[in-house]
Amino acid sequence: MIDEETVQKISDCGIRSIGISIDGGEKTHDTIRGTGCYQKAMEAFGRLKKAGIYCSAVTTVMKNNLEELADIKKELNRAGVDAWQIQLGIPKGNLSDSPDAVVEPGDLEKILDFCYQAADGSLSIHMADCIGYYSKKENALRRLNCPEGKIPVWQGCQAGLSHLTIRHNGDIVGASMCPPDMTEGNIRERTLREIWEDENAFAWRRKFKPELMEGFCHDCQYLSLCHGGCSAIKIFTGGSITAENKYCLYRNTMLGK
């Protein structure tokens, strides 16, 4: 719970941005996260904003909240949230027991259309790296959020290349959706610098060979840049990091999916 005392500690630590999961309207969110969690999250946004902390919401899109995105946006605007990340629920964690809740590849276009239309400046909308790639609307959204000097085009999974995730127990992984067997070390045992600079760390990404990609991805014109998209999507929906990425807008457009 992010109460006033916690907000003060966050501020004192110099943390500038906080992200909180909002996975639907109150009923849907509480079904997923627990009774009362939605209201606590909204109250937390209010306290954080009052303290001048940049607030982000993260929504994991599943079949049961796909039609609630517009209503979620209204509530986030009302709460004064600064940014909103929309990401796909993939069959891992709790969703590994509920594969029917995972959106289909054919739903990507609907999600993209919503993000494109919702990018009205009221809050910054970001599609997570598991949503893409190489469509006009997706590129337009990337341009809106692209830092100066950066190229607004998907350039492959950056896990282990330019960013990493520190889990609650200190484990280091390339991205939050990486499976446990992709853990590179633990900050309670080695320093972050030692782990990051280890020549064998993140080998699955740093030494990835795109020519090993399968299916449509193998012959795709964007392969050298894309490397098959989000690594976690490939692993959890295709079974391996070289599996064809069926959650790709470009692929599905070209194949008429």
Label each PLM-derived region with a short phrase.
Residues 166-167:
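Short, acidic, Ser/Thr-enriched surface-loop or helix-capping motifs
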Residues 211-257:
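Cysteine-cluster motifs in flexible loop/terminal segments that predominantly coordinate metals
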Residues 67-85, 136-156:
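Short, electropositive alpha-helical surface patch
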Residues 78, 82, 97-123, 153, ...:
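A structural motif corresponding to the C-terminal lobe/cap of the Radical SAM core domain
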Residues 1-104:
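Radical SAM/AdoMet-radical enzyme domain recognition
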Residues 106-143, 171-221, 227, 237:
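C-terminal accessory region of radical SAM enzymes
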Residues 157-161:
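Short, small/polar residue-rich loop motifs at catalytic or cofactor-binding pockets
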